[in-house]
Amino acid sequence: MADINSKLEIGVTTGPIRGSRKIHVESARFPGLTVAMREIQLEPSSGEPPVRVYDTSGPYTDPKVTIDIAAGLPTLRRDWIMARGDVEEYDAREVKPEDNGLKGPDRSAGVPPFPNVVKRPLRAKAGQNVSQMHYARRGIITPEMEYVAIRENLGRKQAKEAMIRDGQDWGASIPDYVTPEFVRDEVARGRAIIPSNINHPESEPMAIGRNFLVKINANIGNSAVASDVASEVDKMVWSIRWGADTVMDLSTGRNIHDTREWILRNSPVPIGTVPIYQALEKVGGVAEDLTWEVFRDTLIEQAEQGVDYFTIHAGVRLPYIPLAAKRMTGIVSRGGSIMAKWCLAHHKESFLYENFDEITEIMKAYDVAYSLGDGLRPGSIYDANDEAQFAELYTLGELTKRAWEQDVQVMIEGPGHVPMHKIKENMTKQLEACGEAPFYTLGPLVTDIAPGYDHITSGIGAAQIGWYGTAMLCYVTPKEHLGLPDRDDVKVGVVTYKLAAHAADLAKGHPAAQARDDALSKARFEFRWRDQFNLSLDPETAEQYHDQTLPAEGAKTAHFCSMCGPKFCSMKISQEVRDFAAKQNAGIETFVANEAEAEAGMKAMSDKYDEMGRELYIGAGGREHD
C-alpha cells in the first residue's frame, strides 16, 4: 500500500508524544485483550515513578506499528464481535453518485475512494440485538466493557493509597475502582454508553457517562467552500493525538461518503455524524425535498460504513417551532433549522419524530448510539433556558425512554450559549428529564462578545457543566462563528477542552485526576523543566514559550525562569527557606516548648539578618535592581 499512500498524499502525524511511551495493560478476564495507555517518563534523578495517562491516539503513537492509511487500522474488535454469534454478513447497498453530493465543487483533491472498502458489512441476525446495552441488561460483560474498565482505572490504586479524593460530585456515583461489573451496570441503566458500531472494529472501546472520566469530542469535516479528504483525515489523526475521545465528521460539501470511509477505516476512536446533512445533499440542498425514505437510506449507508453515533434532531417538533420566533437568534442548529423548514413547508410533524421507532430498529441492528440533537439550543445568551429549549429537552427525555425499550444506547445533546448563572439549571433539568442518560454539550459559551476567542468563552462553561455532570464536552475552536478550523485551530480546541474536562474531573473528586497535577507541581518546585513540559497537556507549546526567552540548553536545568529571574523566584526562595529550616532542626527530636526560648531564637535570627545587610540571598549584591 506504500505506493498508493504516496500517490494519495495523505500525510498524518505519527510517533510517540514527547517524553512518553506507549504501554499495554493485559486483561485477566479475556486472554489476548490488551489496553493501550500512555506513560510519561520523568527524570531518573527525581526518583519519581512514571505517570500513566489516558491515551486516545491509537496506533499512531506506537513506534512498533507501521501506519498505512490506504490499508486502514487493525480490526481490534472483529473477533469479539464474531465470537458472539449474533451477526451476519450481507451484501452492502450500492454506493450511488448522490451519496457523495450532487452540488458544489469536488472536494476529493485527487484522493480516490478508499481502496479496501468492505463489500459485506455486518448486521444483527434476524431477531437479534447487538447493542452493548442489550448485552449489559442480560448480565453479559463484553470485552468492550472489560476494556473500558481497565482504561478508566488510571492511577486509581496509587490514588487510593495516597487518599487523594476531594471534590463535590453533585450526586454522581464515582467509584474508587472501576470494575467490569460497574461498567456493565452503568450501561444497563442507561447512565453510560460505549459507542461501538459492529462495522467499526478498528475502534478502541470507551465509555461516555458522568461516573467516568469526562470526555471530549472534536468536530471535523469539509464544507461547500473549504477543505478536502486528505485534510480531514489529517485533522482526525491530529485531534486524537492531543486527546479527542470521539470525532464527529460534519462534512456538508461534496465527497461526503468517501471522506467518511477514509476517516472510519483509520480512526481508533468512535466517529459520529449528523445524517441529515448528507440526506440534504442527496436532494440537492433543498430541505423541503427531504423524505423519510432518503433519510432512512442514509442511516443504513452510514451504519454499514461503521458510524458509531448519529445526531438525530427528533425533538424539533412542529408545535415547538413558533416558540423560537421570539428569540434574538432564532434556530441556530443546522440540523434543527433543516427540520424546522421541512415541518413548516409541509405543515406536518417531523418525519424523524414520527418514524423514531423504526430508526431505533436500525440502530440496534448495528449498535449505533443515539446522540439526540438539541436542534432548538440557544444561539445567544439572550435566548438561554427559554421555553423552546426546554420543550425540546423534555421531548428528548420521552424519546430516550422509547429507545431504551429496545435496548439502544442514548446520549443527549445540550447547549449552546448559556451564562454561568444559568448553567446548573441545564444539568438539573437534563438529569430529571432524561433519566440520567449521558449529557453531551457544546460548551456552553458563557458570553457572546469574544469572536476569535470562543474556545475560551466556551471552555469556561464546559468546565462548569462538566463539574455538574456532563459526560462529554464538544470542543469549540477559535474559528467558531468565523470559519472552518484548520489543524492548528483543531489542536487549540482539543487542548482547551482537555483542560476543561480535567478541571471538571478534579472538581468532581475523581480518584485519579490529581495525580498528574501533583506530579507537575512537584516538577515545577524542583525545577525539572523537561518533566514540566512533558507532563503538560501540550509539551511542545510549553517548551516553545520557555525557550522564547531562555533558549539555551542550560536554562532547562536552571532554578528560575524568565518571569522572575534568579533573585525573585518564589519557589527558589521557598526551597532555600525549607533547606535552612531543615538544617536548623537537624537532630532535634521535639519542638521547643518554652515560649521564652522560642522568642530568643527568633531575635537571634533577626539580628543575624541585620548583620547580613538584610539580603534574602547571601552575596546577592546591592540594591541596584530594586
Curated annotation (Swiss-Prot):
Enzyme class label: lyase
4Fe-4S among keywords: yes
Quaternary structure (record): Homodimer.
Cofactor: how bound: Binds 1 [4Fe-4S] cluster per subunit. The cluster is coordinated with 3 cysteines and an exchangeable S-adenosyl-L-methionine.
Residues involved in [4Fe-4S] cluster binding: C561, C564, C569
Pathway assigned to this chain's UniProt record: Cofactor biosynthesis; thiamine diphosphate biosynthesis
Keyword Zinc-finger annotated: no
Biased composition (Basic and acidic residues): 92-106
Cofactor(s) required for function per UniProt: [4Fe-4S] cluster
Gene designation per UniProt: thiC
Annotated stretches, region: Disordered: 92-117
Name assigned to this protein: Phosphomethylpyrimidine synthase
Function summary: Catalyzes the synthesis of the hydroxymethylpyrimidine phosphate (HMP-P) moiety of thiamine from aminoimidazole ribotide (AIR) in a radical S-adenosyl-L-methionine (SAM)-dependent reaction.
